[in-house]
Amino acid sequence: GLVGSEMCIRDRYIIAKSVPFKPNFTKLATLLDMNRNTVSDLMCYLEKAGIINQLRAETEGVRLLGKVDKVYLNNTNLAYALSDNTPDIGNVRETFFFSTLRVVCPVTTSEVADFTVGGYTFEVGGKNKSQKQVHDVENAYVVKDDIEYGMRNVVPLWAFGFLY
């Protein structure tokens, strides 16, 4: 189980190397040599402890309790601290966006982009990210890294840091 610091460190390391990912608790349970329900509990504990954030679909009721669409580290510092190599910059961008917005409003998954926040759709990427993915989506924005200012439906990623 979860007793012993070696097991907890190994579990966090496996999760840290995999984020963001669409969780399959059954496969995680096999990988971690645990019961599936224990993995589900572990993920909740890691979220409460500020290690991870779980991105959920915009659902209501009992379905919301079990439906996690993606798991991210709680913040970008953890990505660098827990990784052997430089973390994927796309993952770092998404982690930054999600971790800064989730403290001020609910963030859910989007069927066409990365995130939905209060009826607005956001696609996160680098300075060369195109509008193609959200071109026909109402209230959609492209959040770009490595730009100084935005225009129309393009917002610089750094601007979301002011929300935190």
Where are these regions (language model features)?
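Structural signal for conserved beta-strand scaffold positions within catalytic alpha/beta enzyme cores
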Residues: 53-54, 73, 123, 142-144
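Short, structured coil segments at secondary-structure junctions
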Residues: 3, 117, 136-138
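Catalytic cores of nucleic-acid endonucleases
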Residues: 105, 110-112, 125-164
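Accessory nucleic acid-recognition modules appended to NTPase machines
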Residues: 1, 5-6, 10-113
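Conserved catalytic cores of phosphodiester-cleaving nucleases, focusing on short active-site segments
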Residues: 97, 101, 115-130
